[in-house]
Curated annotation (Swiss-Prot):
It comes from Helicobacter mustelae. GO terms for biological process: bacterial-type flagellum organization; bacterial-type flagellum-dependent swarming motility. The gene is flgE. Keywords: Bacterial flagellum. This is Flagellar hook protein FlgE. Transmembrane segments: none annotated. A flexible structure which links the flagellar filament to the drive apparatus in the basal body. Absence of the gene leads to absence of the hook protein, lack of the flagellar filament and thus loss of mobility. Approximately wild-type levels of the flagellar subunits are still produced and accumulate mostly in the cytosol.
Length: 454
């Protein structure tokens, strides 16, 4: 037969062996502890048709021989013991070796020993750690508890690797049958971070105080399920898991209506001044010379300082109407309308003490007895009760407040949200509320709290 055919056949046969090896590797891709193999090729002997010649004396140079190879053969298959990937199996007896090494297993109490990378073990009825094929895993065992008094504490807790290896066995009598837990002792560090991955809604709170004494004691249903409980605002988190982190005197402003005040403006050519929310406003205007009326001049002067007072002025039927929507972040200087000094000139009709208070500041405190009269709160119940009381006060100042019959109810619903309901109390007068919540901030405080925080 032609040599080329022999070489081709040998190549096909050798690559068939290599393909068989790779097929076996693929077939065992999910075999625990399997290490892949590779085929090593070697060329077969060559047939020499012409031998090499040396240079001739007559001047002819030397020539190489003419050799023809006779094909290829598989010399060996080699195991490649590279580190494989590990994965969690949730089986307590499954083990894996990272790096070099083997598990030692034996079918006959150690007379013969085999080695494997397969760590898929389990316990048999006698407590032996065995492979799926029944081979017992061997290694070093810690000293028996009965020997504890004979050796030092350090030696008892040390595994002596100089001793002969033995079967790994755990006495089945050491195992306890499953039973319900009666007491649990826990020692752990609480998460001191400002973010948690899992959050739950705060407990719901009705629109009436839960107890006539303190409004704090929790309420349970007939099945002993906790239904209402006041919670400390300083330990709460937002829906996204970020800590609110309230500290002393941090809090919010809640406006229930737009503050308004209407008054006449006196015509004058001299200087006019007024103090609103402790900000002095003044102007001088001669209507005959400027062509601007005193009421328009007063409007312009007040609007020029709106960023400091929160108050905006309008002219209605020749009268000056002041308005504060209470929607600016800040302290009392930009909330409500308060005349803090007598007006002069065009503002002569504005008297110190005149005010329209429709926004209230609520401040967090760590005190166990918050002063509700100054807007202090500590728990969700404290804040709920404050908002409900003030909302009813703004809606109808003449009505005696009783939380059980309040026409504005405030509660925390089952979703942990503050729910405010303006109920119809039968009064023909339209009593709408325009609620706006803004953050409290002050240049004199480092504990400012913005609406984005909560």
């Amino acid at each position: 037969m032609l040599r080329s055919l022999w070489s081709g056949v040998s190549g096909m046969q050798a690559h068939q062996v290599a393909l068989d090896v790779e097929s076996n590797n693929i077939a065992n891709v999910n075999t625990t502890g399997f290490k892949y193999s590779r085929a090593s090729f070697v060329d077969m002997i060559s047939q020499t048709k012409l031998i090499a010649t040396s240079p001739h004396k007559g001047g002819l140079g030397g020539q190489n021989d003419v050799s023809v190879g006779l094909g290829v053969n598989v010399n060996s298959t080699t195991k490649v013991f590279s580190q494989g990937s590990t994965q969690n199996t949730d089986v307590k007896t499954d083990l894996a070796i990272e790096g070099d090494g083997f598990f030692i297993i034996s079918p006959d109490r150690g007379k013969t020993q085999n080695f494997t990378r397969d760590g898929e073990f389990l316990f048999d009825a006698n407590g032996n750690l065995v492979t799926n094929g029944g081979y017992v895993v061997q290694g070093w065992m810690k000293d028996d508890l009965r020997n504890a008094e004979k050796i030092s504490e350090d030696d008892f807790f040390r595994v002596d690797t100089t001793k002969p290896i033995q079967n790994i066995q755990i006495d089945p009598a050491m195992m306890m049958p499953a039973r319900a837990s009666s007491n649990i002792s826990l020692r752990a560090n609480l998460n001191a971070g400002r973010h948690v991955d899992q959050v739950a809604n705060v407990f719901g709170l009705g629109s009436t105080t839960k107890t006539p004494v303190d409004g704090i004691n929790p309420i349970y249903d007939s099945h002993d399920n906790l239904t209402q409980k006041a919670e400390d605002f300083g330990a709460l988190f937002t829906q996204s898991g970020d800590a609110i982190g309230l500290t002393e005197n941090q809090g919010i402003w809640v406006s229930y209506k737009t503050s308004e005040m209407v008054n006449d403006i006196e015509a004058t050519s001299g200087e006019s001044s007024i103090e609103i929310n402790h900000t002095r406003i003044s102007f001088t205007n001669d209507s005959a010379a400027s062509g601007i009326s005193s009421v328009v001049a007063a409007q312009n002067a007040i609007n020029a300082l709106k960023q400091k007072t929160g108050v905006e002025a309008f002219v209605d039927n020749g009268m000056l109407r002041l308005q504060n929507k209470n929607n600016m972040d800040g302290d009392a200087e930009v909330k409500n309308i308060r005349i803090t000094a007598d007006g002069t000139g065009a503002f002569a009709n504005f008297i110190e003490g005149d005010s329209d208070i429709t926004a209230f500041r609520y401040r967090y405190t760590t005190s166990a007895s918050p002063d509700s009269g100054t807007g202090q709160f500590r728990t969700t119940e404290d804040l709920r009760a404050l908002i409900q009381y003030d909302a009813n006060l703004i809606k109808d100042p003449s009505q005696a407040y009783t939380d059980s019959t309040a026409s504005v109810s405030v509660k925390f619903n089952k979703y942990g949200m503050l729910e405010i309901q303006n109920k119809d109390n039968g009064d023909e007068l339209k009593q709408d509320l325009n609620i706006f919540v803004s953050g409290y901030s002050s240049e004199n405080s480092t504990n400012n709290f913005s609406e984005q925080d909560g």
